[in-house]
Structures are given as C-alpha cells and as structure tokens.
C-alpha cells in the first residue's frame, strides 16, 4: 500500500510540474525550477546563477530540495527535479552531467576542544584509530575505503549519516569523529574541520535527465550556469 501511495504521489507531482511548464511555454519567461541538492558549500555556485537569472527574469522561481545523492538521483531520473547538484560520483548513466570547477575536500570533523583540533591535517593512520561517524554515500562510493586503505569491517564505525546536520550533534556529544567534506561543520559553532593528508577531493556535478524537454525557464538557467562556469575558467 505504501509503495503504490508513493508512486501515485510521484505521478501527481510530475503532472503538476508538467502543467506549470506547459502553461508558461508560450508566454514571457517565467516558471518554477526544481533543484535537488546535496550538502555542499558548492551550492554557492548555483545560487550565484539563480540570482543572476532571477534579477533578469523576476517571474522565475526556484525550489531547492535537500537530500542525499541516491534520493536526488531518483527524483531527477523521474523528472520530478529539473536538476541535481551532486557531491562525488554516482551512476549517472541515465543523466547528462556538467562538472563544476569548484571542488570540496574530505576530512575529519571534531570538537574544538579535542586534542586533534589543532592539527593542520590528519593522516589515514590517525583516522583509522578513531571511532568514526561516516557518510553512507561516501562509504558506498568506495572513495573513503580507497583513501583509508581499509574495508568497513576493519574500521571502528559507531554511526552513519546521510545528511550531516544531525551527525554534527553526534560529534558534539562525543559519540565519535565525523568523516565529511569541508564546510558542513559551519552549522555547528563548536566543531572544526581537519583536512585529510594526502588531500582527497570531492568533485561536484550538475546533472539533468537525458533527453530532458526543458521548460524555457530551466533552459535559461542551464545556459546561464554554463556561461558562468566558462567565465570563471577564463579568469
């Protein structure tokens, strides 16, 4: 019953979105753009484009849906979101991708009063000795396993998370140390980020469904985003 209810709601959401897109197709540039986003400071790159587009076309409105990579990918594939902003590499075989120049880096998040907090960086040998709170997506993609040189069963993983905000409370309460990308600790004033050494980058991608029939508003956003990224590259 819950499965069919979820699928029915997805059909209703997609139908509503299509009706809005069709309504604005032949009029002045306006409409709604839905973007699914993982947690990343790279979101600032998208916001810069959103502001530029909205300043020029004030009847274009944006709707941001936060979530983990797998949930966002599913919604993009089903056409519920126009775009998705991803941290790291998933299976994008059903989608078009555009890599951002901006990259996050992986590291360890701990309390400011922890003895490790003053370190300029942290090595895999040090990390492997700690009780860890890990990103489920990061572990699933194998990138953390590869960097650490160990499998999940060989690590002391006390908890996992899909979005960092609640993981930050676990770190504050001394449950363990979080493996995360940079910037997310800013939501918790008592936490600090220590980068991995050697550095481990997390690439960012803007993605959309293959053969997507964009609304005029979504097409304008994509063109503006690509132009902004190309402009940065030329600077």
Feature names for model-found ranges:
Residues 68-81, 87, 139-192:
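Hydrophobic hinge/microswitch elements
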